[in-house]
């Protein structure tokens, strides 16, 4: 009862749809509010969307425009830690302690020991015992994790059926997404885990993606010949950028340690476990593709499909960027042959053959083909004189990486009879 509650969730949505002459539209707005079953956790979300589908030139020119927005705000609870602490802590102990010694825990009951740090604040004589179970209620209330997220996305599609040559149509689309997230972590200096030092951290993350493609498609039937041809290109870009920082909330150390350098103002905090940490990173990758497909149907008996795709990835070094992936498939509808067309109980008998190559580039880090040097962590430093300096080390790389290719073959038979009451596929 001290860490759990009955969760309540509300969800509201309003939508409007209609049409203005040749332009159907739909708009919607939604709001969601939820409380978690673990106390202190909750989530608020607002989302909106708009869709327009105008049609012009006697329905030869068609558009589809979509835009979406989402904003979400969360408070996360350390549910796993709180539940584990509740199972470990002596249930006969109170939530709040009695006595001045519990001032160092914000009044919450915790198992205390004498403080014996390398740098000791005389006003802080006790600290929490890391070998004892912590107070789960204190954990929930003294650790605050807040997150904000915004997401914008849009897609624009256009399709044009050529006047006087309606078997040919041109299609193009462009989509984009932008996401921004921010998370703040604050651990009280009265907490079990960061007693006295406390902790405050901030993480920012941004990403945006863009994907565009264009293709032409021609489909026509010439007597017993049915042809469908498609050719096009696609390009995509993915960008990521992140930043985080964290530091201890220990004003006493700042006020009572000598300054090493008057110009920089750096303090002698080499023994301070709450030293500030910062990290920033960014990466991106892109993909360029060209593709084509041919479908040929003769007499509705013999079907041939061939495809070809060429993909160029920024994840590989020059000379290894491109992969080429052909495929072919053949199907024979045997039950459409003259020697079987009078067999009334036979619904389907088809022979299938296929061959193709596919490529894989996922799971490979961006710029993995480039030798990079990485700055060491703050605790992996080298002493030089009175200062400590971070080191750099080369990261692993492979400039021979290229597309992982897989070749597949397949053959099969489809059979159905007695009005499809009996069927199988091999």
Each language-model region and where it sits:
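Short secondary-structure transition/capping segments
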Residues: 38-40, 76, 317-318
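N-terminal, post-signal-peptide soluble/periplasmic segments
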Residues: 1, 58-100
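Extracellular/periplasmic, surface-exposed regions of secreted and cell-surface proteins
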Residues: 10, 45-46, 51-57, 66-71, ...
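Outer-membrane beta-barrel translocator/receptor signature
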Residues: 1, 5-49, 58-61, 150-152
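Anionic group-transfer/hydrolysis microenvironments
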Residues: 30, 190, 307-309
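A short glycine/small-residue-enriched secondary-structure motif
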Residues: 186-194
